[in-house]
Amino acid sequence: MTLAFTTFAISKINNSSTNEDSKVMILCDEHHPFEKGYFKSAIRAFGNSIKLGLMGNSRPEDAASIFQDKNIPHDLTTEEFRLQLVCMAFSWFIFGLFIACLLLCITLVLTSRYPGENENKATEVVPSSNIDDEEKQLSLSDMI
């Protein structure tokens, strides 16, 4: 079973979508060959998704109007268009992981500097001079 990816051509004149059989991805009449690189597309989509997240928009459909001026044609490929939601989720996961590690480090630093009362009492050695004389006598009589 072979997976076939469909690419679309979006024309500026009548805003209609048509199927394209070649391996060329077209968006706003700009051609982007598939051999341009999947890694480069993923990196650009990751950067665009972070920009969208900082602007408070999680939908990649609005990417063209957010990033580019209407007079300047944008070069967002369909592959980057598909990757933006995944990259958005991944960027929020990394951000959450960073915050969790930061909170864990702060907690560990604070607990190492200021031990709790229970831990402090358990590790202290009670000096023998603080024991009453009666307790000393009781302990000596128990030994005999």
From Swiss-Prot:
Membrane-traversing stretches: 90-110
Subcellular location(s) of the protein: Membrane
Region (Disordered): 120-144
GO cellular component entries: membrane
Membrane topology: Single-pass membrane protein
Annotated keywords: Glycoprotein, Membrane, Transmembrane, Transmembrane helix
Top-level division of the source organism's lineage: Eukaryota
Glycan-linked positions: N14, N15
Name used for this protein in its record: Putative uncharacterized protein YOR186W
Source organism per UniProt: Saccharomyces cerevisiae (strain ATCC 204508 / S288c)
Lineage: Eukaryota, Fungi, Dikarya, Ascomycota, Saccharomycotina
